[in-house]
Amino acid sequence: MKRRRFALDIRPGAVALLAGLYFLLPLRWCVRLALAVVVHELGHVAALVLCGAEVYGLRMEACGLALRCAPPEGAVRTIAAALAGPAAGAGLFCILRGLGYPEGADLSLLYACANLLPVLPLDGGRALEAVVAALAGARAAERLLDVLGLVLPVALMGLGVALFARGMGLALGVFGAWLALLQPGMTCQGGKHDVKYSYYQM
């Protein structure tokens, strides 16, 4: 079978997102964030290749990055592919800490932990979906992730508002709103119900 050429799909929203980050963050933090994102995605790619899944491309949009690939076969491979990104981020944390770059290390760890939240289309949600589907069936997994996809973003937004009222910034609330936008039926969907491709968000 002929292999497909890797495709990079950059949406207009991605350009706006990158421009916003450039103007809102100091250049050094943009570089640190870019390093964390690249290492995270390379972790996914390495695991997918080792699991025998073909990677078709990378899509950049207003809600972040989505790695497009053939769905890995079996729960174990799906879990491994999902957790490989955060694992790579944790490895980068250790390396940067050892080299004396604590800011970049902490950002990489924060990025990895955020992706482990049990909500689709994040890595933690994909891993949880595979586990529940293997133990209780795909329908039970879908119902659980639907509930988490509603409850968790709302909880994060509520907590973010409470923290903002205490003068601690809006970051958590914005993150919760971003997660809400990634849920099916919203503006930025994570490809949850796509049967042809699997997407690894961020």
Where on the chain are the PLM-derived regions?
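Hydrophobic transmembrane alpha-helices and their immediate loop junctions
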Residues: 1-202
